[in-house]
Amino acid sequence: MSIFIGGAWPYANGSLHLGHIASLLPGDILARYYRAKGENVLYVSGSDCNGTPIAIRAKQEGVTAKDIADQYHEEFERCFRSLGFTYDCYTRTDSEHHHETVQNVFLRLLEEGHIYKKTVEQAYCETCTQFLPDRYVEGICPHCHEAARGDQCDACSAILDPLDLLEKKCKLCGSTPSVQETEHFYFALHTFQEQIKTAVENVKQTGTWRDNAIQLTERYVKEGLQDRAVSRDLPIGVPIPVEGYEDKKIYVWIEAVTGYYSASKHWAEKTGEDDQEFWDSEAKTYYVHGKDNIPFHSVIWPAVLLGIGEGAIPRHIVSNEYLTVEKRKLSTSKNWAVWVPDILERYDPDSIRYFLTVNAPENRDTDFSWREFLYSHNSELLGAYGNFVNRTLKFIEKYYGGIVPKGSIDVELKDKVEGLYKHVGEAIEQTKFKVALESIFDAVRFANKYFDEKQPWKQREDNPVSCEETIYNCVYLIANFVNLLEPFLPFSSERIRNTLSIVNRNWEPQHTLPSRIDSVQPLFERIDVKQIEHEVEKLYGAVK
């Protein structure tokens, strides 16, 4: 089976925060799981280097947009690598390859009659002497009356036009923009109304889109899909490939989602592989992002794919809700965030991955609390999983000289492990990552109980053969926990693999066990509560 996984493209205008990772981490879990199953996986993403936020930041700092994009693209790559993300292709939207691919898609849509020209009114700043792209205009949402940008309201998820806003202001200088006529290209989104409606009806039956994606898309369909501008007067971006319009740029909402397609084509060129299997109707596709990106993946991207004749419209939409920080809405402008480069300096990446999975905002907003982070690490990773692994391996090191004793697999444990692979696999495929990880840790707690009830420290004196059986079965459980937890906790899984010399990485019960162990080290270190108190003080002290 061909599995395509697309992770949303973060804007390269500032550091990643935990909210980004909370929405993107499911993509890596899926990719690792499906590879272990032996499926053909293509997992792509990249940095959005063409967005208006980058141009705004560059202007504020007196540098070029490329300077900003280069800085954060490189930082993103380091962060994703440090967190264990296994992208097959992580690229950027200001690359020549991306520009060519997007222009080809634009021309195909134009040739098929899905794009047309239209004279429209647009916000114009007399002070800055320029037309204002959507994100250069800020004001009040006409629907919910919250602060909003000219392209979308984060509060109510309404897709907006800058002229819809109340109390409009130029983001660059703060003046009230005027309205002038200009010519732009438009995407005939209304012509895909019935196809999008059918797609939503289908996923309601299969349950393969998150509820928030279904509900929001149903709302758009009910209101009637509106044609959207596909060009803008932007300072940076992909030029319109039509004579006389080269100064205009392809609008980011269609250009950025086409990044999945361009990254796929880039991967194919780089590897010599054929990527077409990931774009036909038989492919299993997952799009992983936050709820603010829903309309771009549930309406616009499917319409683009239908418009260019590709069959692989999103089968799974994994649209997480928001992550708050210490019960407050995350705010980058106020520096109310936990920044990824910062947290990676001091904490195990598996601790971050574990917390953001068991506390994932899958169906509702969830909160990152430093105290809860401490608890999840010390109680679950260290106290449950690390404890079981270390007590078993230390016992072997101390009493068997590092040689794993002979034994036979307990039938009850064997059935439990085989059932766990099936249950966890199904949960991952259904994008229920929290359920999957909690099921494994239920088994970890069972394993600790098994060790305690068998009391191998007594068996060693009273019944050495039973002791060997107990320890053998504990190693059996560890070997399988390593495989089951690989998609979630790749770093600790790798450490145990090295200790036990486990080679098999397939998603299947491990019945062949290692014969010896090498240099047992603690799987996790305890986090001191004083360190967490310092983190909380630092967070509150950094607020602008």
Swiss-Prot record:
The keyword Transferase does not apply. This is Methionine--tRNA ligase. It catalyses: tRNA(Met) + L-methionine + ATP = L-methionyl-tRNA(Met) + AMP + diphosphate. A motif ('KMSKS' region) lies at residues 329-333. Signal peptide: none annotated. Disulfide bonds: none annotated. InterPro entries: aa-tRNA-synth_I_CS, Anticodon_Met, M/V/L/I-tRNA-synth_anticd-bd, Met-tRNA_ligase_1, Met-tRNA_synth, Methionyl/Leucyl_tRNA_Synth, MetRS_core, MetRS_Zn. Its EC number is 6.1.1.10. Is required not only for elongation of protein synthesis but also for the initiation of all mRNA translation through initiator tRNA(fMet) aminoacylation. Keywords: Aminoacyl-tRNA synthetase, ATP-binding, Cytoplasm, Ligase, Metal-binding, Nucleotide-binding, Protein biosynthesis, Zinc. ATP binds at residue 332. It comes from Bacillus cereus (strain AH187). Monomer. Belongs to the class-I aminoacyl-tRNA synthetase family. MetG type 1 subfamily.
